[in-house]
Amino acid sequence: MKSDLPVISLIGTGHATSHFLQLVLPPLFPLMREELGVSYATLGLILTLFYVLSAVLQPLAGFVVDRIGGRAVLLGGVSLMLLGTLLMGLSQGVWSLALGAALSGIGNSVFHPADFAILNGRVTRERLAHAFSIHSVSGSVGFAIAPIFSAGIGAWMGWHAALIAAAAVAGAVLLLLATNAGRFAVEAHPAAKKAGGFDVSVLLSWQVVACFLFFALHAAALTGILSFGVSALKEQLGIATTLASTAITAYMVGSGIGMLAGGFLTARTSRIDLVPAAGLSASACIMLALATGVVPALALPAAFALSGFAVGLTYPSRDLLVRAATPPGATGRVYGFVYAGLDVGSFATPVFYGWLLDHGTANGVFYAVFGFALLAVFTVLQLPARKPAIQRT
């Protein structure tokens, strides 16, 4: 345990930082719009640039991780996000903002392939479920801190200061990781060293494709809840924004608790495919109840909290399922490819959900979430059911 804890803590800190830096920019949009005289659409395009580069380059980062190991790639990713955030903080116009966002997006692309290569390579099998659980929770913590941090400093000292302060946080984390880099060094697998070029054949196996589809469908459902849940609840039930927002917050809190509990559950079961199947099925049933309108308004926070808890349970097991589908020497590229599915699901569905709301079918948002969740259950049941044997990256 002593050798595992520093690795899990360091990688979790890096993951929290990546999520923190992803979300420091949007709360500053009103201040940036006023000072720079640009539209929200323009600022939205800058944010889109970040996520597109992150999604497209994530599989490529996985290939690099497999070839040289995760340590150098992770440190490089943190460095790029630091530089990108600092450049945005110093920028005086849209083009420098876009360049900073691009650098940050490139840096963000490395975290999932590098993190999971390191965790799989350094953490003992018995503690992997807990390691994946903490990894997921750390990302949520980064998301939770970012809006408070950037909005608070932005209101006090301006958006430039907020971004420069965020870059300083990244600098402190980079220093922490660099001075402890020996703790998470992982040698590239011999199979990856022997492979020439960028062999994508491993990504075309049905198991890996099923993992990608599972992540994409899960993200599609999550987008409906987090991005359109408040609007859908208001339109469908005519409730106040505060109650609708409280319900979504309850979902996130329940999800975080579920992630921690999921680590213990996954560590104690051999049929790891049943955990995400059961969790998503339970969440889907709650979404169906919401769509049909049988849940009273005052019970919405409790219903969303239960749904979030059920989904949170699935996070550690889904990462172990990806591990089970990964051949030796391909950890980086498989995790990079599969996690790109989250970005695809997030990009592909907002217009659809918006169309449902525009056409007066607010409950259709929850019917759609229900459908995406059931499709995700189908894909996860196609994956290896047993815990993977120990393999090194």
Regions found by a protein language model. Name each.
Residues 57-69, 259-271, 357:
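Helix-to-loop junctions at the C-terminal end of transmembrane segments
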Residues 23, 51-59, 143-144, 252-256, ...:
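Residue-level signature of mid-helix packing/kink "hotspots" within the transmembrane helices
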Residues 26, 207-252:
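Extracytoplasmic gate region of multi-pass secondary transporters
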Residues 135-182:
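Helix-loop-helix hairpin linking two adjacent transmembrane segments in secondary transporters
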